[in-house]
C-alpha cells in the first residue's frame, strides 16, 4: 500500500504535496505514523491550512518524525503551514493533523482532521458514520433560499425567532436554520441568550484573547408566542422528518428559559400533534427539564464531551451545577420515556482512552441511552489537549472506531450516527454497522 504523502501550505494558503515525506497524524499528545484508516477526501470536505502550525512528516527511509520548518517551491523558501481537512455531515474524525505550534494564534473553531495525499488525490482519517442523506450539503444554500426566507419574513414580519434564523441561514449557512425556510426535517428554534456554562470551545461566546467565536449569540430572547408561531408552522407543514429543536449554536442554554419554552410547547401542541419537539441542552437543570417534559417535550439531546466528571467540568466550566445534575436530568428524561440522545463531542486521543470509554459505556448502559450522535469537537486541538491534561485525561487513545465498537457490543440497542432520529425512525434497527465504510 502506498502511504499518503505529507501536505503543507504556503503562507498564502496554497496546499502542496511534499515530494518525499509521508503524512503523520496526531492522537492526543502523540504524533504517529498511522497504519490504516484513511479514505478519499469526501465530497464537500475541504482542505484548510493551520496558521502558526508547522507540519510534521515521516521520513520514509528511517520511519522517524521530521519537523518541516522550511520549504522550497519554485526557487523560493518559506515557512510552511500544516494542513487539515474539514469533513461534511455524516463523517466522524478519527485522527488529528500532525502538527506542532510555532507561536501562532489559537486556531478558529473547526474540527481539524488529519489529511494527506494518496495515489488518487487527497485522503483523510475518518469514518462514515451516518449514510442518511437529508443533511447532504447540496440540499442547502440553494438558489431558491433567499426567496424562501423572504416569504417567511413576509408571513411573520415581527417575529424575532425568524429574524435570528435569517442571520444564521445566510451568514453562517446553518442547516438547521435553513430547514425552517425549506419547511423540512429538523428546524431550529433559538430561545436563550444566557448560559450557565463557560465551555472552552463555545462557538457563540469567547473571552478576550480566545479563539474568535464562529457565531454571534442571540442578543434578545424571543417570547413564547414567537417561538410557538414558528414551531407550530414548521411542524404542521414540514416535509420529511418533521421536528423542531430548542437549543442551537447561536444561543446559550435553553433550560434557562424553561418557562417560556414550556408555554410555547403547550401552544404548539394545542394546534398540532405532528412531528417531534426536541431540546439540545447541557441538562444542567432537572427541575426546568421536568417542566418541559410536563408540557409535551418528547426528545432530549444532551451535549457532553465526557462521562468522566473531572474532564466534563474542566471543559464545560459549569456555573451553578455539577456533573451529578446532568445525570439527574438523564435519569428524569429516561423515567419520563423521552427519547434520550447524547450529543457526544469526540476528540481523538482523549475520548477513546480506556478510562473515557469505560465511563461512557457505563453511562449508556445505566440509563439505556437511545442514541449517541457523534460530533467532532470544534476546537484548536492543542487548546483541548491542555484542558485534558489539567483534568488528568491524557491517557493513550485506542482509536475512535474501537470506541464505537465497544459501545455497540455493550449496548446492542444503541443507535450510533450523526443525525437526529425522527419519531418513526426511533423504533428501527440501530444505524451502526461494524464496517463503517
Language-model-detected regions and their locations in the chain:
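Auxiliary Fe-S-binding modules of radical SAM enzymes
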Residues: 1-156, 358-437
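N-terminal [4Fe-4S]-dependent radical SAM core
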Residues: 105, 110-189, 206-210, 214, ...
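Core AdoMet radical
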Residues: 186, 190, 206-263, 269-288, ...
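Short cysteine clusters
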Residues: 195, 199-202, 246
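Active-site beta-loop-alpha junctions enriched in small/polar residues
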Residues: 249-251, 282-284, 305-307, 345-349, ...
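Alpha-helix-loop-beta-strand connector modules within alpha/beta enzyme cores
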Residues: 258-274, 323-338, 392-417
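Catalytic cores of alpha/beta
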Residues: 287-294, 349-366, 428
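Conserved strand-turn element in the central/C-terminal portion of the radical SAM core barrel
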Residues: 317-319, 329-356
